[in-house]
Amino acid sequence: MSKQLTAQAPVDPIVLGKMGSSYGIRGWLRVFSSTEDAESIFDYQPWFIQKAGQWQQVQLESWKHHNQDMIIKLKGVDDRDAANLLTNCEIVVDSSQLPQLEEGDYYWKDLMGCQVVTTEGYDLGKVVDMMETGSNDVLVIKANLKDAFGIKERLVPFLDGQVIKKVDLTTRSIEVDWDPGF
């Protein structure tokens, strides 16, 4: 299999998807995309995977839709056994490949780890995850151990201007208009 061990590992790696189970006998794999538009995962190259603690670059040879899935063919992956070795590998790219966003737009990866504080100064905790609900994104905030309200996790809608008052990526903080009791 033609995977390249690379000294040029992604500087700021970001996971864009995951390889699923093999498909057929010629080395095809199902692929699951985390990008907003599933097909956008193919716009970002090269892809990296991590096997046994080593970064490896893989080259996309082809992709296509198959029923509800997308399947991929990687260069050098020519049979089912080789494809099975890549099942569950995360597809990683360097975040420098992502397009620049307009003012007030943020990548979820940039919000992770930010401290969330109410407009009154109450520390709600840190962003540990994000959820897409259809109507708006939601911050998943892990509360501080000694939270005065006994809350372990908070879900705060990412509604710019209404709930989210200020995002400062330099200080890694988000100011929200939110009742800490929720």
From Swiss-Prot:
| InterPro entries tied to this protein | PRC_barrel-like_sf, PRC_RimM, RimM, RimM_N, RimM_N_sf, Transl_B-barrel_sf
GO cellular component, as recorded: cytosol; ribosome
What's a Gene Ontology MF term here?
rRNA binding
Q: Which SUPFAM superfamilies match?
A: PRC-barrel domain, Translation proteins
Q: Which top-rank group of organisms is this from?
A: Bacteria
Q: Does the keyword RNA-binding apply?
A: yes
| Recorded phenotype for the gene knockout or disruption | Disruption causes slow growth, incomplete processing of 17S rRNA, accumulation of 30S and 50S subunits and decreased translational efficiency. Altered levels of ribosomal proteins in 30S subunits; uS2, uS3, uS14 and bS21 are severely depleted, uS5, uS7 and uS11 are decreased, distortion of rRNA helix 44 near the decoding center. Slightly different results show ribosomal proteins uS2 and bS21 are not found in 30S subunits, decreased uS3, uS13 and uS14 in 30S subunits.
Induction of its expression:
Translation of the mRNA is repressed by a stem-loop in the first 150 nucleotides of its own transcript. Part of the rpsP-rimM-trmD-rplS operon.
Enumerate the Gene Ontology biological process terms. maturation of SSU-rRNA; ribosomal small subunit assembly
The entry's keywords: Chaperone, Cytoplasm, Ribosome biogenesis, RNA-binding, rRNA processing, rRNA-binding
What does this protein's UniProt record list under function?
One of at least 4 proteins (Era, RbfA, RimM and RsgA/YjeQ) that assist in the late assembly stage of the 30S ribosomal subunit. An accessory protein needed during the final step in assembly of the 30S ribosomal subunit, for assembly of the head region (the 16S rRNA 3' domain). It may act while Era is associated and before RimP in 30S subunit assembly. Essential for efficient processing of 16S rRNA; a deletion mutant accumulates 17S rRNA. Deletions do not assemble the head-associated ribosomal proteins correctly. May be needed both before and after RbfA during the maturation of 16S rRNA.
Cited NCBIfam families? 16S_RimM
The record describes its quaternary structure and partners as: Binds 30S ribosomal subunit but not 70S ribosomes. Binds ribosomal protein uS19 and probably 16S rRNA.
Family classification: Belongs to the RimM family.
Its domain comment says: The PRC barrel domain binds ribosomal protein uS19.
Name the record gives this protein: Ribosome maturation factor RimM
Q: In which organism is this protein found?
A: Escherichia coli (strain K12)
**Corresponding gene?**
rimM
